[in-house]
């Protein structure tokens, strides 16, 4: 049930009847304060200006045409022309019943699209670090939300599995007689990578051999391809352990590494030349873009093939976008890549559009994000100043959560405690990130994220168990409740019901904007409203059975909404804490 969309269409029709143009926008918003109703229509100012009339006058005319019978109990004009809409308690009660009768809590499915989501993208032969966390979990929230809404989602893990580093690694492995790479752990490869880079920089003979190995690898030599495949396999096996720990939905089948697009690159360069988009410049092949200027104010040159015939990331990203449209048949492509890559992506996509590889009707969206910072406001590092490995971060989260959970549950069985600690610890790390606007940097703080107060995973998980405890005390099951009516008489009942029915609107925003913090804010607000409702509207000691059962149903929908909302974030819920 999308009340916002329903009201938007009703108010828009009334605006048109009052003389507004057919493309007018009512600007229906959830009201910030209860005295302004449940929703506000804020679009009168902009439309009235076009019509040359006072906004309040337009609002008055709109009200004469606005039929919200059975939806709103009161509609009033406020200030210069805002229209405040108060939802009818009977309308709320009816739709709470409908939501409870639905496995999807009444959430509709929009027109199905094929959506490619590019996220995580670790590098081969390197362990995942904290810099991969944001892309991985924000992207996974988008995937979960879009799939719940009924879209066909293709996960694209754009793994860095190609380039000169493989010449270095294979040459060094060979030198160290470690050709059976399949038996090695990724931690060994990290050391090998550092040693290989050191030798590459300091030993010209070794560097030359590494460059030759890259050529052999790229030419398809089976020995070198097999070594490369082993390196990829070790890396992705290790990464899968991290994905499973993080409770994200990526699997090995979702890997679409840079190497996938290699066969396309020569044809793309030739095609861009044939279309007059790419030209030779100082030995390289370059596309000059008017949309981007260099320091002299001239069109910026984007290299797609180097003098030595090598290709660049831009060339791969052009091929990647083309593949996602032509082969995967994407209607929309979302990229969860950090903000530092924005100009690079914009340049690649400008070339993609000019070449006609992806039509303008198919959105290519960079859902960029900021950095994770330490308490000092600088990029999050180890005490020694090194990069924090993601596995180490999750280990520490689990250890801290174990201590926290054991302190609160001294007699809990060990296996149950471990399961609870895992849900709390991993959930805390994820929620702390997801609850922040993805476009901003944020401070990583263990104490805040593991707190049982505020907008945190432990608080949300506890809020869920608190609602469940009401049912345990009531000793009533869902089947017994099903036939009971929902009756809304108290203000706090109405406020909770209205917020519960805004779940679909929240999902729609997350799906459109890729903003998990909107879902976190909604769930936190919902938990707070339930707390106020529970305090002021007795459930188990209600004045009669009808009121008791009605309030139990509001509690029931609250529990289901919290669980489903947290599930879209990949946050595990628990029955007891």
UniProtKB/Swiss-Prot annotation:
It is an enzyme of class 6 (ligase). GO terms for cellular component: cytoplasm. A motif ('HIGH' region) lies at residues 122-132. Disulfide bonds: none annotated. Keywords: Aminoacyl-tRNA synthetase, ATP-binding, Cytoplasm, Ligase, Nucleotide-binding, Protein biosynthesis. It is found in: Cytoplasm. Its EC number is 6.1.1.19. The keyword Methyltransferase does not apply. Gene3D superfamilies: Arginyl tRNA synthetase N-terminal domain, HUPs, Isoleucyl-tRNA Synthetase, Domain 1. PROSITE patterns: AA_TRNA_LIGASE_I (PS00178). One of its GO terms (biological process) is arginyl-tRNA aminoacylation. One of its GO terms (molecular function) is arginine-tRNA ligase activity. The keyword Protein biosynthesis applies. SMART domains: Arg_tRNA_synt_N (SM01016), DALR_1 (SM00836). It catalyses: tRNA(Arg) + L-arginine + ATP = L-arginyl-tRNA(Arg) + AMP + diphosphate. It comes from the Bacteria. Monomer. Belongs to the class-I aminoacyl-tRNA synthetase family. This is Arginine--tRNA ligase. It comes from Shigella flexneri serotype 5b (strain 8401).
């Amino acid at each position: 049930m999308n009340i916002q969309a329903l009201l938007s269409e009703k108010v828009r029709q009334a605006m048109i009847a009052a003389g507004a143009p057919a493309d007018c926008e009512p600007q229906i918003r959830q009201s910030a304060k209860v005295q302004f109703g449940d929703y506000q229509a804020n679009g009168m100012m902009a439309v009235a200006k076009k019509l040359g009339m006072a906004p309040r006058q337009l609002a008055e005319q709109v009200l004469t045409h606005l039929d919200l019978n059975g939806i709103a109990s009161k509609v009033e004009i406020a200030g210069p022309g805002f229209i405040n809409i108060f939802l009818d308690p009977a309308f709320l009660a009816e739709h709470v019943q409908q939501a409870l009768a639905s496995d999807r809590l009444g959430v509709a499915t929009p027109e199905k699209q094929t959506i490619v989501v590019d996220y995580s993208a670790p590098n081969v032969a390197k362990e995942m670090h904290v810099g991969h966390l944001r892309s991985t979990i924000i992207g996974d929230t988008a995937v979960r939300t879009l799939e719940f809404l009924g879209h066909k989602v293709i996960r694209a893990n754009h793994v860095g599995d190609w380039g000169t580093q493989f010449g270095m690694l294979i040459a060094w492995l060979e030198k160290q007689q470690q050709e059976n790479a399949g038996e090695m752990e990724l931690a060994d490869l990290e050391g090998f990578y550092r040693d290989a880079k050191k030798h590459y920089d300091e030993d010209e003979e070794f560097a030359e051999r590494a460059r030759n190995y890259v050529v052999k690898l790229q030419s398809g030599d089976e020995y070198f391809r097999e070594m490369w495949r082993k390196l990829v396999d070790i890396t992705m096996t290790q990464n899968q352990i991290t994905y499973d720990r993080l409770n994200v939905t990526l699997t090995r089948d979702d890997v679409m590494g840079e190497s996938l697009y290699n066969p396309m690159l020569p044809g793309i360069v030739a095609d861009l030349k044939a279309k007059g988009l790419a030209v030779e410049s100082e030995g390289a092949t370059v596309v000059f873009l008017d949309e981007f200027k260099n320091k002299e104010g001239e069109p910026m040159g984007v290299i797609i093939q180097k003098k030595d015939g090598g290709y660049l990331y831009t060339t791969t990203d052009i091929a990647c976008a083309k593949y996602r449209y032509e082969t995967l048949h994407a209607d929309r492509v979302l990229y969860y890549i950090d903000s530092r890559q924005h100009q690079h992506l914009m340049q690649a996509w400008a070339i993609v559009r000019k070449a006609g590889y992806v039509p303008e009707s198919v959105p290519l969206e960079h859902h960029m994000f900021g950095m994770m910072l330490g308490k000092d406001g600088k990029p999050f590092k180890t005490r020694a100043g090194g990069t924090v490995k993601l596995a180490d971060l999750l280990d520490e989260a689990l250890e801290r959560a174990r201590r926290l959970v054991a302190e609160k549950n001294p007699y809990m069985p060990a296996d149950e405690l471990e399961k609870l600690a895992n849900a709390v610890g991993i959930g805390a790390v994820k929620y702390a990130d997801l609850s922040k606007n993805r476009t901003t940097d944020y401070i990583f703080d263990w104490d805040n994220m593991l707190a049982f107060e505020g907008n945190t995973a432990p608080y949300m998980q506890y809020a869920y168990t608190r609602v469940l405890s009401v049912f345990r005390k009531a000793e009533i099951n869902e089947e017994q409740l099903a036939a009971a009516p929902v009756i809304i008489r108290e203000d706090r009942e109405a406020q909770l019901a209205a917020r519960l029915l805004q779940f679909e609107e929240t999902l729609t925003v997350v799906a459109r904007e890729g903003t998990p913090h909107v879902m976190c804010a909604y769930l936190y607000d919902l938990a707070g409203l339930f707390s106020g409702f529970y305090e002021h509207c007795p459930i188990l000691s209600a004045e009669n059975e009808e009121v008791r059962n009605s309030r139990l149903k509001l509690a029931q929908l609250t529990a289901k909404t919290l669980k489903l909302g947290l599930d879209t974030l990949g946050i595990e819920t628990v029955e007891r804490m």
